[in-house]
Each structure stands twice: as C-alpha cells, then as structure tokens.
C-alpha cells in the first residue's frame, strides 16, 4: 500500500511533477547555498565557453535533484538526457547513451549508486577523457576500440552516499548535499503550485500542509493535490485552513507529518526500554525490508531528532518519548 507521505515517486506522478516543476532559478525555492554556488559555476563556464564539470547530488528522495538537473540544462542552454542506473545493465546500454550525446549535452543518471562495477569501469574514461573504451571479442583475440565522445556533463543523483564507490565519487568536480526544506520554503512552493493548479491555497493552509510534508517538496505537492480534491468536492473556491486540516486528518497525516508507518517504527524504539534496536529487528517487526526503513523512514526522523543511531542499533530520543507523552527514562514502555 502506498503512503500519502511516501518520499519516493509514485506511479503516474511524473507528468504532474513536470507540470509544477520550476524552469529557472527565479522559480526554484530552497537549497540557497547550492543555488548560489551553481550560479557562479554556470556563469563561469558560460563565460569561458566550456561545459560544466561533472556534478553529484546527494540526499533523500523528493528534494529536487532531478529538477536541479533540468534547471542546469536550461541555464546552460544544453539538451538533457535522463536515465536511471537500473536501466543501464550492460556495456552496450551505456555505450548507446554516450554515443548519442552531442557537444555540451547533460546526462542525468538517477540512483547512480546502483551502477555495477563493470559499468563504472566504462564510465571512468568517458568522464575523464571523453573517450569510450569498448572491448570487442574475448580471449587472445580481444581488442579494445577507442571511441571519442563529445564533451558532456554527467549529473548523478543518489540517496545512498555510502554506496557510491570512491573512484566514481572522485571523478565528480562538484558534490552537493541536498537539505530538507523548512516550513517557510515549503509554504512558498505550495502557494505557487496551488496557483498553477487553479485552486489557490491561503497562507495559513499552505503552512498547515508544509508542517506535515516532512521537509520534502514532493510530499508537499502530493498533499496539496489531495487537499485540493477535498476542497473541490466541498465546492470551496480556495483552500482554507479548516478544509486543509480536515483533509490531512482524513489522509492519516498527523501534525508532525507522521503516518502509521512512522509511529509503528517509533513505538518499537520506545518499547525497547532504552535498549538499542538493530535495523534487522525493526524491519522484521514492521514486516518491511531494511532498505525501506533506512532510506524512507529514518532520514526525516534522524534529521529532526526523533532517534539516534549507535554502533549497537537505534535508540529513541527524549523527543520521541514526549511525542507519546511518556517520561524519558530507560525503563519506559508504551504499554
């Protein structure tokens, strides 16, 4: 069952996201330090008549890595080719993509941490020397064919920084860590998107949605679309605070942006009576895979102080006990 606050992209969301995607720096809200630095690097590259160095974006899903790649291509006046690492299974897949690029093009690879080691080996000379080394044949008769490539910019995006190999990471000239958004930034995103959706969201309503959006624009826009549906059925011309609160309650998203999955996770930590809980134990208790827990549930809870990771496992913080109105003591239990 899909969560309304799922940070991964849901099916059929691509077209909706594209329609609400900012096209330039003036429309892009948040990530101010990254925007400033990229603005300098883009302007410098344009003045020199060169392409950009390769760029790597780290961070949880839904923070705008793909959007930034499109804005960079727009600002550089370059074409962009978008793909994901799981789509590049064989050397021929990568060769087909690289040989179809033109001078100055941008290649965006999402989930780049999922590239196999053999594909990475082919990518290294392409990134460094703009050359493709293809081995034809096998055994003593094998030959290496070198194909010159146009100068291009590779933009990689990953949610798993630790899974990027050191040799690949070192070939990116720019590395940026995407931060969660604050309520003010999300409120602006929601307000602008509501105008595009032709159902204006009042400021207090936008803030109410923003507070429950887990610091993530993708979640904020999804909640906005669903709240808009409630307002539409109620024959409301605008999204008012009462309608927003009612809709969010019906959607099962509480004041902290938590749903049942988050609360189940936190209850497990609280019930451990202060003892660290291993990731495998949590995943088994929740009937979820470890990757979902680590990539989807934990980042927001960690960033906002609801848990700590130790060498022995996960531990609930004082803030988590307060969430359940429990005293912060090692032997506390939910039941």
UniProtKB/Swiss-Prot annotation:
InterPro entries listed in its UniProt record: AAA+_ATPase, AAA_lid_4, DNA_helicase_Holl-junc_RuvB, P-loop_NTPase, RuvB-like_N, RuvB_C, WH-like_DNA-bd_sf, WH_DNA-bd_sf
Q: Which amino acid positions bind ATP, per UniProt? A: 20-21, 62, 65-67, 128-130, 171, 181, 218
Q: Does the keyword Hydrolase apply?
A: yes
**Which NCBIfam families does the UniProt entry name for this protein?**
PRK00080.1 (NF000868), ruvB (TIGR00635)
The alphabetized UniProt keywords are:
ATP-binding, Cytoplasm, DNA damage, DNA recombination, DNA repair, DNA-binding, Hydrolase, Nucleotide-binding
Q: Cite a single Pfam family from the UniProt record.
A: RuvB_N
Q: Does the keyword ATP-binding apply?
A: yes
Documented EC number(s): 3.6.4.-
Source organism per entry reads Wolinella succinogenes (strain ATCC 29543 / DSM 1740 / CCUG 13145 / JCM 31913 / LMG 7466 / NCTC 11488 / FDC 602W)
Name the family. Belongs to the RuvB family.
Write down what this protein is called.
Holliday junction branch migration complex subunit RuvB
Detail which positions bind DNA: 309, 314
Identify the Gene3D superfamilies for this entry.
Answer: 1.10.8.60, P-loop containing nucleotide triphosphate hydrolases, Winged helix-like DNA-binding domain superfamily/Winged helix DNA-binding domain
* Region Small ATPAse domain (RuvB-S), annotated ranges: 182-252
Biological role stated in the UniProt entry = The RuvA-RuvB-RuvC complex processes Holliday junction (HJ) DNA during genetic recombination and DNA repair, while the RuvA-RuvB complex plays an important role in the rescue of blocked DNA replication forks via replication fork reversal (RFR). RuvA specifically binds to HJ cruciform DNA, conferring on it an open structure. The RuvB hexamer acts as an ATP-dependent pump, pulling dsDNA into and through the RuvAB complex. RuvB forms 2 homohexamers on either side of HJ DNA bound by 1 or 2 RuvA tetramers; 4 subunits per hexamer contact DNA at a time.
> GO terms for molecular function, please?
ATP binding; ATP hydrolysis activity; four-way junction DNA binding; four-way junction helicase activity
> Which parts of this chain are annotated as the region Head domain (RuvB-H)?
255-335
- Subunit structure as annotated in this protein's UniProt entry: Homohexamer. Forms an RuvA(8)-RuvB(12)-Holliday junction (HJ) complex. HJ DNA is sandwiched between 2 RuvA tetramers; dsDNA enters through RuvA and exits via RuvB. An RuvB hexamer assembles on each DNA strand where it exits the tetramer. Each RuvB hexamer is contacted by two RuvA subunits (via domain III) on 2 adjacent RuvB subunits; this complex drives branch migration. In the full resolvosome a probable DNA-RuvA(4)-RuvB(12)-RuvC(2) complex forms which resolves the HJ.
Quote the record's domain comment.
Answer: Has 3 domains, the large (RuvB-L) and small ATPase (RuvB-S) domains and the C-terminal head (RuvB-H) domain. The head domain binds DNA, while the ATPase domains jointly bind ATP, ADP or are empty depending on the state of the subunit in the translocation cycle. During a single DNA translocation step the structure of each domain remains the same, but their relative positions change.
The protein's annotated catalytic reaction(s) are: ATP + H2O = ADP + phosphate + H(+)
Chain segments carrying region Large ATPase domain (RuvB-L):
1-181
> Any idea which positions bind Mg(2+)?
66
Q: Report the subcellular localization.
A: Cytoplasm
Of the GO CC terms on this record, one is: Holliday junction resolvase complex
The biological process GO terms on file are:
DNA recombination; DNA repair
